Curated annotation (Swiss-Prot):
Protein's organism: Streptococcus pneumoniae serotype 19F (strain G54)
Keywords: Cell shape, Cell wall biogenesis/degradation, Isomerase, Peptidoglycan synthesis
Family: Belongs to the aspartate/glutamate racemases family.
Free-text function comment from the UniProt entry: Provides the (R)-glutamate required for cell wall biosynthesis.
NCBIfam families, A to Z: glut_race, PRK00865.1-3
Pfam annotation, one family: Asp_Glu_race
GO BP terms, alphabetized: cell wall organization; peptidoglycan biosynthetic process; regulation of cell shape
Active site per database record: C73, C183
GO MF annotation terms: glutamate racemase activity
Segments passing through the bilayer: none
Protein name: Glutamate racemase
Catalytic activity: L-glutamate = D-glutamate
Keyword Protein biosynthesis (UniProt): no
PANTHER family: GLUTAMATE RACEMASE (PTHR21198:SF2)
């Protein structure tokens, strides 16, 4: 038993899609979240800069005495997860392998699509992980550089957003039976993405799949929070506007949250 919180980091608000799933599946666990919205999106940035920024977020979470860190950002997972996992003495999870595994299970025709930031797609990490598990599957990857900025701006269902999503995803329509949402921002656009891709395409939320792995590790290391540990005190931090973060966060999590601005 370990009553310390679980730490989450992301380039912005996208990681809240993972937090929402954790609140649903593991409602007794406490959360500390840091979103680097001031420097979002990470996708177009060079790998070394992503590495530097991600380590800053990790070190911030370590000051909060977290028992586990979840890199709730596909771009950061692709660039630096292995390094962070090797250097810390607490469990560190990324969101890519769970998403790849879930896509393999859900694919009926062996044609998997991956959408993500330019860096995630350029790294080719989803294709590599999928082919490690099943080399016979076809994988089509597509960079969607405009999606995360739309989510960060709060434009989740405007006509402009619908047009951007349609025009961006058009090359994949009719070509895949499963689609990995390879950025934790993208589930906030899920209804629009599903509408464009069609009802038969299975959308895979890599962040939500990650929560199953969180549960497994909590049990394996015996670090679940005690049921009688007292009231939860979730803490949310952002490097940008706390008001903007709270507005998106409360809409997505369907509860009031307190958000604090921090400088890194």
């Amino acid at each position: 038993m370990d009553n310390r919180p679980i730490g989450f980091l992301d380039s912005g608000v996208g990681g809240l899609t993972v937090v929402r799933e954790l609140m649903r599946q593991l409602p007794h666990e406490e959360i500390v979240y840091i979103g680097d919205s001031a420097r979002a999106p990470y996708g177009p940035r060079p790998a070394e800069q992503i590495r530097e920024y991600t380590w800053q977020l990790v070190n911030f979470l370590l000051t909060k005495d977290v028992k586990m860190i979840v890199i709730a950002c596909n771009t950061a997972t692709a660039v630096v997860w292995e390094e962070i996992k090797a250097q810390l003495d607490i469990p560190v999870l990324g969101v890519i392998l769970p998403g790849a595994s879930a896509a393999i299970k859900s694919s009926q025709g062996g044609k998997i699509g991956v959408i993500g930031t330019p860096m995630t797609v350029q790294s080719d990490i989803y294709r590599k992980k999928i082919h490690d598990l099943d080399p016979d599957l076809q994988v089509e990857s597509l960079a969607c550089p405009k999606f995360a900025p739309l989510v960060e701006s709060g434009a989740l269902s405007t006509s402009v957003t619908k047009k951007v999503v349609y025009e961006t995803l058009r090359p994949l329509v009719g070509k895949v039976d499963s689609l990995i949402l390879g950025c934790t921002h993208y589930p906030l656009l899920r209804p629009i993405i599903q509408n464009v891709m069609g009802p038969k395409v299975q959308l895979i939320d890599s962040g939500a799949e990650c929560v199953r792995d969180i549960s497994v590790l909590l049990n394996y290391f015996e670090i679940n929070r005690g049921r009688d540990a007292g009231p939860l005190h979730h803490r949310f931090y952002t490097t940008a506007s706390s008001q903007s973060f709270a507005q998106i966060g409360e809409e997505w999590l369907e509860k009031e949250i307190h958000v604090e601005h921090v400088e890194l």
